[in-house]
């Protein structure tokens, strides 16, 4: 009986159509169970595997981790701004600024305000980031040198900067004939008015050339044979022309009416230099005396200055009218006050360093106490003086006779005219006195220089009987328009009356 029971059990085991008790669960059952419920204990699975004598389905002692899935709800952003570095005040200012009307400040004022804000805040408010994702970099240690230091300059550098040097034409813009001009170093034969009219003395006549229209007019001609014109000078307003003659006369002409207003005779020798200071006309003669004429009154001769022993060939009032500079054939430069002192008319300064006749005298237009003088053939020097202290600021050997000096009102430069051997015009940089350019073309010595009212053109009269116009101080068009708008017309004091 027991044999039949054993066979029945063996047959049921070999059929394999029933689940095996205590056997490991199938893989598909395990996967389904893991998806719906907690995973089975690792120890229990390991025990079942070893009890059955089969290879385990997973590493013993290692838990079966759950598969990572994308969360259904969004989490926080990793890019969180730092509250300490956030420009919350700037954000509030910019939001409130949108509702405010724009002020009518000038572009220059806005640029200054922008530069101040950049220096104070360390950044541009208009372009500042409100939220910062990281802190500012640390400053460089003290004394650290960086080759790119220019990138961290306090001052904003423009994207494009204009070249420091400018173009100076080496050829004259125009050449005019000046026949019978007297080849005399001591005379002053050309002057340019504020009305853009050039006066030229040719022997015994005075001609006027209108630079705007090109018209030429003969203003006067001496009546006596042998007499000639020795000097010309326009009043500042440009309506009246003073003419010095070889017969010791000073004539005053109304150019618009082409009429001589008066003839002033107080000198004893030819009048070789003239200079205006409002209604006071100063004249220097071969006798060495300087006379002041008040053209408003009948008794015009109001003062006599005696500071030279030979001919006064250079005479120029300062732009502010406080000082008068005179240069003579006695190699002396005197600086006179505008009025007499306690001891009368005495020079404030007397300079004796020149070794030749001093015809070239010119005042600096932007610094009223600076005077430039040039000596003749025996001296060949240009000297810069401080008339307040009496000090010679600089002296340059130009290796030729100096006939005239002019300052440029647009550039910190001056131009000088020279004689033998090259008869050239030289532009100098102030205060270094470095040579900027040389303008050549005259075949004989330069006698006189004068400047156009806009300060862009220099006219040079030379012994080769030519008058050359050099556009050596041409102004930038944008800057010229600004200065033209800022300039104001002044009424002439001469209209108070000329008798």
From Swiss-Prot:
<dbReference type="GO" id="GO:0031145">
    <property type="term" value="P:anaphase-promoting complex-dependent catabolic process"/>
</dbReference>
<feature type="modified residue" description="N6-acetyllysine">
    <location>
        <position position="66"/>
    </location>
</feature>
<feature type="modified residue" description="Phosphoserine">
    <location>
        <position position="161"/>
    </location>
</feature>
<keyword id="KW-0963">Cytoplasm</keyword>
<keyword id="KW-0131">Cell cycle</keyword>
<dbReference type="GO" id="GO:1904668">
    <property type="term" value="P:positive regulation of ubiquitin protein ligase activity"/>
</dbReference>
<feature type="repeat" description="WD 3">
    <location>
        <begin position="266"/>
        <end position="303"/>
    </location>
</feature>
<dbReference type="InterPro" id="IPR033010">
    <property type="entry name" value="Cdc20/Fizzy"/>
</dbReference>
<keyword id="KW-0995">Kinetochore</keyword>
<comment type="function">
    <text>Substrate-specific adapter of the anaphase promoting complex/cyclosome (APC/C) complex that confers substrate specificity by binding to substrates and targeting them to the APC/C complex for ubiquitination and degradation. Recognizes and binds the destruction box (D box) on protein substrates. Involved in the metaphase/anaphase transition of cell cycle. Is regulated by MAD2L1: in metaphase the MAD2L1-CDC20-APC/C ternary complex is inactive and in anaphase the CDC20-APC/C binary complex is active in degrading substrates.</text>
</comment>
<feature type="repeat" description="WD 5">
    <location>
        <begin position="353"/>
        <end position="395"/>
    </location>
</feature>
<keyword id="KW-0158">Chromosome</keyword>
<dbReference type="GO" id="GO:1990756">
    <property type="term" value="F:ubiquitin-like ligase-substrate adaptor activity"/>
</dbReference>
<keyword id="KW-0853">WD repeat</keyword>
<dbReference type="GO" id="GO:0005654">
    <property type="term" value="C:nucleoplasm"/>
</dbReference>
<dbReference type="GO" id="GO:0000776">
    <property type="term" value="C:kinetochore"/>
</dbReference>
<dbReference type="GO" id="GO:0033597">
    <property type="term" value="C:mitotic checkpoint complex"/>
</dbReference>
<comment type="pathway">
    <text>Protein modification; protein ubiquitination.</text>
</comment>
<dbReference type="GO" id="GO:0007064">
    <property type="term" value="P:mitotic sister chromatid cohesion"/>
</dbReference>
<feature type="repeat" description="WD 1">
    <location>
        <begin position="182"/>
        <end position="221"/>
    </location>
</feature>
<comment type="similarity">
    <text>Belongs to the WD repeat CDC20/Fizzy family.</text>
</comment>
<feature type="modified residue" description="Phosphoserine">
    <location>
        <position position="41"/>
    </location>
</feature>
<feature type="region of interest" description="Disordered">
    <location>
        <begin position="27"/>
        <end position="80"/>
    </location>
</feature>
<dbReference type="GO" id="GO:0000922">
    <property type="term" value="C:spindle pole"/>
</dbReference>
<feature type="cross-link" description="Glycyl lysine isopeptide (Lys-Gly) (interchain with G-Cter in ubiquitin)">
    <location>
        <position position="485"/>
    </location>
</feature>
<feature type="repeat" description="WD 6">
    <location>
        <begin position="397"/>
        <end position="438"/>
    </location>
</feature>
<keyword id="KW-0132">Cell division</keyword>
<keyword id="KW-0206">Cytoskeleton</keyword>
<dbReference type="GO" id="GO:0090129">
    <property type="term" value="P:positive regulation of synapse maturation"/>
</dbReference>
<feature type="repeat" description="WD 2">
    <location>
        <begin position="224"/>
        <end position="263"/>
    </location>
</feature>
<dbReference type="GO" id="GO:0048471">
    <property type="term" value="C:perinuclear region of cytoplasm"/>
</dbReference>
<dbReference type="GO" id="GO:1990949">
    <property type="term" value="P:metaphase/anaphase transition of meiosis I"/>
</dbReference>
<dbReference type="GO" id="GO:0050773">
    <property type="term" value="P:regulation of dendrite development"/>
</dbReference>
<dbReference type="InterPro" id="IPR056150">
    <property type="entry name" value="WD40_CDC20-Fz"/>
</dbReference>
<dbReference type="GO" id="GO:0045842">
    <property type="term" value="P:positive regulation of mitotic metaphase/anaphase transition"/>
</dbReference>
<keyword id="KW-0677">Repeat</keyword>
<keyword id="KW-0832">Ubl conjugation</keyword>
<keyword id="KW-0833">Ubl conjugation pathway</keyword>
<dbReference type="InterPro" id="IPR015943">
    <property type="entry name" value="WD40/YVTN_repeat-like_dom_sf"/>
</dbReference>
<feature type="repeat" description="WD 7">
    <location>
        <begin position="441"/>
        <end position="480"/>
    </location>
</feature>
<dbReference type="InterPro" id="IPR036322">
    <property type="entry name" value="WD40_repeat_dom_sf"/>
</dbReference>
<dbReference type="GO" id="GO:0040020">
    <property type="term" value="P:regulation of meiotic nuclear division"/>
</dbReference>
């Amino acid at each position: 009986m027991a044999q039949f029971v054993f066979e029945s059990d063996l047959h049921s085991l070999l059929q394999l159509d029933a689940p095996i008790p205590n056997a490991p669960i199938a893989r598909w059952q395990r996967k389904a169970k893991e998806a719906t419920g907690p995973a089975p204990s690792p120890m229990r699975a390991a025990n079942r595997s070893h009890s059955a004598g089969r290879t385990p389905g997973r590493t013993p002692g290692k838990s079966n981790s759950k598969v990572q899935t994308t969360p259904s709800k969004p989490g926080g952003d990793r890019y969180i701004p730092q509250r300490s570095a956030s420009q919350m005040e700037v954000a509030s200012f910019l939001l409130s600024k949108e509702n405010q009307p724009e002020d009518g400040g000038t572009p220059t004022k806005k640029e200054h305000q922008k530069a101040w804000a950049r220096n104070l805040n360390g950044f541009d408010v208009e372009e500042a980031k409100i939220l910062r994702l990281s802190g500012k970099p640390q400053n460089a240690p003290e004394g650290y040198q960086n080759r790119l230091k220019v990138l961290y300059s306090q001052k904003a550098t423009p994207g494009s900067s204009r070249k420091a040097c400018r173009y100076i034409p080496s050829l004259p813009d125009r050449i005019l004939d000046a026949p019978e001009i007297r080849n005399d170093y001591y005379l002053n034969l050309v002057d340019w008015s504020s009305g853009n009219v050039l006066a030229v003395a040719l022997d015994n006549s005075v001609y006027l050339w209108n630079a705007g229209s090109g018209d030429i007019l003969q203003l006067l001609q001496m009546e006596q044979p042998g007499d000639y014109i020795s000097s010309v000078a326009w009043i500042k307003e440009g309506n009246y022309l003073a003419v010095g003659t070889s017969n010791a006369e000073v004539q005053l002409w109304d150019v618009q009416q082409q009429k001589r207003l008066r003839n002033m005779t107080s000198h004893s020798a030819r009048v070789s230099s003239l200079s205006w200071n409002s209604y006071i006309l100063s004249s220097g003669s071969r006798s060495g005396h300087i006379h002041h004429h008040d053209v408003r009154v009948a008794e015009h001769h109001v003062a006599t200055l005696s500071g030279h022993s030979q001919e006064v060939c250079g005479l120029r009032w300062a732009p502010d009218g406080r000082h008068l500079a005179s240069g003579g054939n006695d190699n002396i430069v005197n600086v006179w006050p505008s009025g007499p002192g306690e001891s009368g008319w005495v020079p404030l300064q007397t300079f004796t360093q020149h070794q030749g006749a001093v015809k070239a005298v010119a005042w600096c237009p932007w610094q009223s106490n600076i005077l430039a003088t040039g000596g003749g053939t025996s001296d060949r020097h240009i000297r810069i003086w401080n008339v307040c202290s009496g000090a010679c600021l600089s002296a340059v050997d130009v290796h030729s006779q100096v006939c005239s000096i002019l300052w440029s009102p647009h550039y910190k430069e001056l131009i000088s005219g020279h004689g033998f051997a090259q008869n050239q015009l030289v532009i100098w940089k102030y205060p270094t006195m470095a040579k900027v350019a040389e303008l050549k073309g005259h075949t004989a010595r330069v006698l006189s220089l004068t400047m156009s009212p806009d300060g862009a053109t220099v006219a040079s009269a030379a012994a080769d009987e030519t008058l050359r116009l050099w556009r050596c101080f041409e102004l930038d068009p944008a800057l010229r328009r600004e200065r033209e708008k800022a300039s104001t017309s002044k009424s002439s004091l001469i209209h108070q009356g000329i008798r």
